[in-house]
């Protein structure tokens, strides 16, 4: 019988495994990101090699690529921005491919420039959906976000009232559904990342653009995810003061929730591309943030044991 092509195998990811008579729980690492900038960082690095000329497959409008990243077997996919696209694409990845764990890299905004500035990479310890809320009636006494506190030039009443932040329901195959706010990064992978990246040197310049200082990797922070990108300083300060969130993006919590619901290992690498309330970084600095996040993700991937076939 003629052997199936790689693309056919990817359409039915267990086909090759069944032919080999290997019983295997996991085969590859899943690498996910949102933007063209992120994908360009991967391609520009020269570290990715496709398995063959026919090693990609389109599912539900997303293209999944099978190959190696500096020798480690991966499937990567560009998900598109915002939480619904990330969650949908990641669920397809986990349902259709044999994935050992999920690595996300992408861009985020800093909510505390004393902690992180453009070019730095954050490896958060926990992420949360801060866009899930109950908008209260005017003069409600409940709600953490009080719009009247932000009236200018003086505080006072505001018809927008207050907003109460809510937990989300997390489903899991082995536990009853439960409500959670903070979603913890897989502890073993977070610890592995802190060890692998503790002395990492990031890229400072791209083209003729250089960062004013040496970029660094920051560990152990918390991150906020919502479907709006936070550029407003007052709201960024609110998230920092009330939730101790140091970065904000539109996707990390979706990676966390989907991975946890499927009981998969996962880790997040955020390249800081701007500071809330300050002038937006130019495209070269934004790309540099993507590239540094990619470098951190790659070094982590190459530091963990490679998933093996059970019959090897």
From Swiss-Prot:
Gene Ontology MF annotations: catalytic activity; nutrient reservoir activity
A biological process from GO: nucleoside metabolic process
Induction note: By photoperiod. Short days stimulate accumulation, while long days inhibit.
Gene3D superfamilies from the UniProt entry: Nucleoside phosphorylase domain
Functional note: May play a role in nitrogen storage.
Subunit structure and binding partners: Monomer.
Protein name: Bark storage protein B
Species annotation: Populus deltoides
């Amino acid at each position: 019988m003629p052997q199936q092509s790689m693309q056919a195998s990817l359409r039915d990811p267990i086909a090759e495994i069944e032919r080999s008579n290997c019983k295997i729980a996991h085969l590859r690492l899943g690498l996910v990101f949102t933007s063209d900038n992120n994908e360009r960082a991967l391609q520009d690095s020269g570290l990715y090699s496709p398995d063959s000329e026919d090693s990609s497959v389109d599912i539900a409008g997303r293209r999944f690529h099978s190959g190696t990243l500096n020798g480690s077997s991966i499937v990567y996919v560009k998900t598109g921005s915002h939480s619904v696209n990330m969650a949908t694409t990641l669920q397809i990845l986990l349902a259709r491919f044999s994935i050992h764990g999920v690595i996300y890299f992408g861009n985020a905004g800093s909510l505390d420039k004393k902690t992180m500035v453009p070019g730095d990479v954050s490896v958060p310890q926990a992420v949360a959906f801060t866009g899930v809320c109950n908008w209260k009636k005017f003069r409600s006494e409940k709600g953490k976000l009080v719009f009247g506190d932000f009236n200018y030039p003086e505080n006072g009443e505001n018809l927008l009232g207050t907003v109460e932040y809510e937990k989300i329901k997390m489903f899991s195959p082995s536990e009853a559904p439960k409500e959670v706010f903070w979603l913890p990064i897989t502890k073993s992978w977070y610890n592995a990342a802190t060890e692998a990246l503790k002395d990492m040197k990031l890229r400072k310049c791209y083209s003729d653009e250089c960062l004013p200082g040496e970029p660094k990797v920051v560990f152990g922070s918390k991150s906020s995810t919502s479907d709006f990108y936070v550029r407003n300083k007052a709201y960024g300060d609110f998230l920092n003061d009330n939730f101790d969130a140091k970065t904000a993006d539109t996707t990390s919590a979706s990676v966390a929730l989907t991975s946890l619901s499927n009981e998969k290992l996962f880790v997040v690498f955020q390249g800081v591309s701007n500071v809330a309330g300050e002038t937006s970084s130019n495209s070269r600095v934004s790309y540099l943030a993507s590239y540094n996040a990619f470098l951190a993700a790659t070094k982590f991937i190459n530091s963990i044991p490679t998933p093996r076939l059970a019959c090897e």
